[in-house]
Regions:
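Aromatic- and Gly/Pro-enriched helix-to-coil junctions and flexible linker segments
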Residues: 27-188
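Sec-dependent bacterial lipoprotein signal peptides
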Residues: 1-26
Length: 188
């Protein structure tokens, strides 16, 4: 056996062993960029939905706290920057929800049930009740916050239109109860 063939065989065997070992631990080690391959709703359409969720569900005694499985970050509750107060009125010192907070809330929601979320999105958002957060908000499962939305109302349409890939921003604004702030640009 030539030296080049021996080296190639050893490298190939080592690669196979390494690959098998990586497969064995792949579930316990997150990828370096923490991304997983699932179908998910369009994040660029999420800010109006996030504003509604922050207003309705993101108070510090509900989903605006770190200990919850579904955490909401935004100007009305939990902030990523500890120097930001949970207050949206920019005219009185409040600060709008940041792009990083929209992203954190998006990841929290999409990551709750990634396989189910992928199934709902692949189906064009036709079966939103497969998702626990929709069932709880509709009062179909126990929820400390009670029933929050009714199928077909503006609050429900805000969420389900986003899941279907075409966010109804009018429904989100109506559900919020006041005009939304423009989404701030991401910083450098």
């Amino acid at each position: 056996m030539s030296r080049g063939v021996l080296v190639a065989a050893l490298v190939g065997s080592f690669g196979a062993l390494l690959g098998a070992g990586a497969a064995a631990v792949s579930c316990s080690i997150a990828p370096s960029d923490s991304r997983i391959g699932i179908a998910a709703p369009d994040e660029s359409q999420f800010p109006p939905v996030s504003d509604f969720l922050d207003h309705r569900c993101g108070t510090l005694d509900c989903h605006g706290q770190v200990g919850r499985n579904f955490r909401i970050w935004g100007c009305e509750g939990m902030r990523l920057d500890p120097n930001d107060v949970p207050y949206c009125n920019r005219n009185q010192g409040g600060k709008s929800t940041t792009p990083a907070e929209y992203n954190a809330t998006y990841r929290s929601l999409v990551g709750l049930e990634p396989t189910v979320m992928s199934q709902v999105i692949a189906g064009g958002g036709q079966d939103p009740e497969l998702l626990t957060f929709v069932r709880k908000a509709r009062g179909l499962e126990s929820h400390k916050g009670g029933t929050l939305i009714t199928p077909g109302d503006d609050q429900d349409n805000c969420i389900t239109s986003w899941l279907a890939g075409k966010t109804d921003t009018t429904a989100c604004t109506n559900a919020l109860g006041y005009p939304m702030f423009p989404v701030p640009e991401a910083g450098p």
